[in-house]
Amino acid sequence: MENRKREKGAPFIEIKDLSYAYPGEEGRGQQVLSHINLTIREGEYTVILGHNGSGKSTLAKLINLVIDDYTYAEGQILVGGRDVMADDLAEKDLLELRRQVGMVFQNPDNQLVATIVEEDVAFGPENLGISNPELRERVDAALATVGMSEYAHHEPHRLSGGQKQRVAIAGIIAMKPRCMIFDESTAMLDPLGRREVLATMEKLNREEGITVLSITHYMDEAARADRVIVLSDGQILLDGTPGEVFAHADTLRTAGLDVPQCTAAVQYLQARGVCIRGDLNTPEQCAAALLDAWRTRGGAGRTQAGK
C-alpha cells in the first residue's frame, strides 16, 4: 500500500524476514511472528495495531531487547545499523541499543523505582554514568517536556495514572533515546490520563523529533499517526497512512478491529451519496469535513449521483 508520509529520514529500525517462536517446555513453542519485513525511519510516528495474540507486543520487545532469547528466531532486526540478534554483541553494545530505543510499558507502577519523582527520572541516566550538572539538566528538561516539573518533589504513588505514566516517559527521555516504544501505554488509564499521554507522545515526535512506535488496539490513537501497520496472526496485514488503512474496513474487521467511530460515520454517509472529502481520521477532521460538505452543497452535501 502506498504511504505518502513515510519518507521521514534514514532507516533506523530495519526488520528483515523476521520469524519468531517462543521456547516451549519441549522445544519450539507457538509461532508468534512470520516473515515480517518492516522499516521504521527516523522521525516517524508509527502505530502497530492488532488484536490480542497478533504478535505486536512480541515484536516491540524483540526490537528493544526485552526478549533476547533467539533460539527459535530467524531473520534480522537492525537498530541504527546494528543487528540486535547477532551472537557477538558485547554487553556495552546491548546497553547502548537499549538506551537508543526506550520502552514505556502498560503499567507505570512496574516502571517507577524511586520514592520521589525527580529521583525516579534520574535513575536511568545515573546508571549510564551521567553526573551533575548534566544529570540535573536532563532531569529538569525531561520533566518540563512531559509537563511534570511542578511534581518533581512529589511521591509517585500519590499521582494519577496519567501522571505516573508521564513520569515513566520522562525517565526514558532523560536517557536521550532516538526512538521510544509505547507498548499499550494507555490501556490502563482513564480518558483524561489517555489524553495526557497521547499529547506527550505527539509532542515528543512533532517537537523533539523522537521516533515513536506505539503498540495499541485503540483505533483513535492510530488515527493521529503518520503510519499505521496492522498485524494479524503474526503477519503484516495492512501498512499505510491512517486514511489508507481505514479505507479497508472489511479487512480490519477480519483482524478483529474496526475503524474509528467518526470515520465509520463518515464512510456510512459517503456510501449513501454524501460528498465528503479530506482527511477523515480524527473527530476534528471528520467534523470539519462534514461542515465543509454542508457549506459547499448549500446544506445538501450530495453528489450528482446522490441527488
Residue map of PLM features:
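Conserved ABC ATPase "signature" region
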Residues: 83, 133-151
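A short, flexible loop at the N-terminus of ABC-type nucleotide-binding domains that lies
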Residues: 2-15, 20-35, 67-70, 87-93, ...
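Conserved ABC ATPase signature
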Residues: 155-159, 163
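Catalytic Walker B motif of ABC-type/P-loop ATPase nucleotide-binding domains
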Residues: 180-183
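ABC ATPase NBD Q-loop/coupling interface
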Residues: 76-96
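Conserved catalytic motifs of ABC-family nucleotide-binding domains
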Residues: 176
